[in-house]
């Protein structure tokens, strides 16, 4: 759990060798990059708000790795973290985002009309579609580092902004503190609300401090546009609905997101963004678009096929279990989404999901008729 910088000065009484974490059993991006030399060079640095190298790496020290997913193992505490600790973050980002270089520039495209197709995914196989992203509000520390006052200020700003939305986006805010245990669980089960802070990644990085203070969910009246406030990021914006109309989900996502961004800009609080990293978020894995376009899709035959993993890899897609990142697939229903966040625009990422899922559903239908799919396996995208 992050400490104040005074604690960091206390640690400096010990040599870098004495303080260097034991990463011998670790399988995460941070552990691959952090050497005793790098630790020594960066450990006395801190951002203007007092975030230190030990704060950056603590979650990766406490969580050696994940059996299915190579975790990142480090977080940012504020916008400046990516600059002050760039000697650690840059190689992690390059590793995690397919060779994205420190000199590369990220591109943004939130024009939903540039998406081709996406309104014809077969609802017999595609059960639900959703697109999400994160946003950070300039001038405030990020969740691993923010104070109670900062967190409450972020909530106040966000609620004022969201409550001014109209039309299809008109909705209301539900603070976590005011919910009963049952209401909370129901929203989690319906995939509307973030889970309780049991994830070791959340706990070790300090994001769960003061829980549930200043956390909540805002959604429009028909629950197709949601905003989580103060979980892993200041804001998580989600557009979702049942069935396979990804085109409509993406339209609502882009339109709603632009409206929110406008309101924040007018209030003098733009979102954190840089030309190199795109939208700045807490976890380096989400930099760039922060976008995850995903569908819940039923693939009983294809998921048993020996080339299933390779097909996903070639389509630049990632699979998760039905309930999210740490869960198993129930009834052969997988959560399939884009693997990339940085270096591709929002439209390009959703296009990969639409095209890839369409192809996989066609493969599933072929396998149902006991026909081979070898000639359908795509080249690497």
From Swiss-Prot:
Its EC number is 2.7.3.2. Gene3D superfamilies: ATP:guanido phosphotransferase, N-terminal domain (1.10.135.10), Glutamine synthetase/guanido kinase, catalytic domain (3.30.590.10). One of its GO terms (molecular function) is ATP binding. One of its GO terms (cellular component) is cytosol. It is an enzyme of class 2 (transferase). ATP binds at residues 128-132, 191, 236, 292, 320-325, 335. Residues 11-98 form the Phosphagen kinase N-terminal domain. Residues 125-367 form the Phosphagen kinase C-terminal domain. Pfam families: ATP-gua_Ptrans (PF00217), ATP-gua_PtransN (PF02807). Predominantly found in skeletal muscle, but not in the heart. GO terms for biological process: phosphocreatine biosynthetic process; response to heat. It catalyses: creatine + ATP = N-phosphocreatine + ADP + H(+). Residues 99-118 are annotated as: Disordered. The keyword Kinase applies. Dimer of identical or non-identical chains, which can be either B (brain type) or M (muscle type). With MM being the major form in skeletal muscle and myocardium, MB existing in myocardium, and BB existing in many tissues, especially brain. Reversibly catalyzes the transfer of phosphate between ATP and various phosphogens (e.g. creatine phosphate). Creatine kinase isoenzymes play a central role in energy transduction in tissues with large, fluctuating energy demands, such as skeletal muscle, heart, brain and spermatozoa. Belongs to the ATP:guanido phosphotransferase family. This is Creatine kinase M-type. It comes from Gallus gallus.
């Amino acid at each position: 759990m992050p400490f104040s910088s005074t604690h960091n000065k206390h640690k400096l009484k010990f040599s870098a060798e004495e303080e260097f974490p034991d990463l011998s059993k670790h399988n995460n991006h941070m552990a691959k990059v952090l050497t005793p030399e790098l630790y020594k060079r960066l450990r006395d640095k801190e951002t203007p708000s007092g975030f230190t190298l030990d704060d950056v790496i603590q979650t990766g020290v406490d969580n050696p790795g994940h059996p299915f997913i190579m975790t990142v193992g480090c977080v940012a505490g504020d916008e400046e973290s990516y600059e002050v600790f760039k000697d650690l973050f840059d190689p992690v980002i390059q590793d995690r985002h397919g060779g994205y270089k420190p000199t590369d520039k990220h591109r943004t495209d939130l024009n939903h009309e540039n998406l081709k197709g996406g309104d014809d995914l077969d609802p017999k196989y595609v059960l639900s579609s959703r697109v999400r992203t994160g946003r950070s509000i300039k001038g405030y520390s990020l969740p691993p580092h923010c104070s109670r006052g900062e967190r409450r200020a972020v909530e106040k700003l966000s609620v004022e902004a969201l409550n001014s939305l109209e039309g299809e986006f008109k909705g209301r805010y539900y603070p976590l503190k005011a919910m009963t245990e049952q209401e909370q669980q129901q929203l989690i089960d319906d995939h509307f609300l973030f889970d309780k802070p049991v994830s070791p990644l959340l706990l070790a990085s300090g994001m769960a401090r003061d829980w549930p203070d200043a956390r909540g969910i805002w959604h429009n009246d028909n629950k197709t546009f949601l905003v989580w406030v103060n979980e892993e990021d200041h804001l998580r914006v989600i557009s979702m609905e049942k069935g396979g109309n990804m085109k409509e989900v993406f339209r609502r996502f882009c339109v709603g997101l632009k409206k929110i961004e406008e309101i924040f800009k007018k209030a003098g609080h733009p979102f954190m963004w840089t030309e190199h990293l795109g939208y700045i978020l807490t976890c380096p894995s989400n930099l760039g678009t922060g976008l995850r376009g995903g569908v819940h899709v039923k693939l009983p035959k294809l998921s048993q096929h020996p080339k299933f993993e390779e097909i996903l890899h070639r389509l630049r897609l990632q699979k998760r279990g039905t309930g999210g990142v740490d869960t198993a697939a129930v009834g052969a229903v997988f959560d399939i989404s884009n693997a990339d966040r940085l270096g591709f625009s929002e439209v390009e990422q959703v296009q990969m999901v639409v095209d890839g899922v369409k192809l996989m559903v066609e493969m599933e239908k072929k396998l149902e008729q006991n026909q081979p799919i070898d000639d359908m396996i795509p080249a690497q995208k």
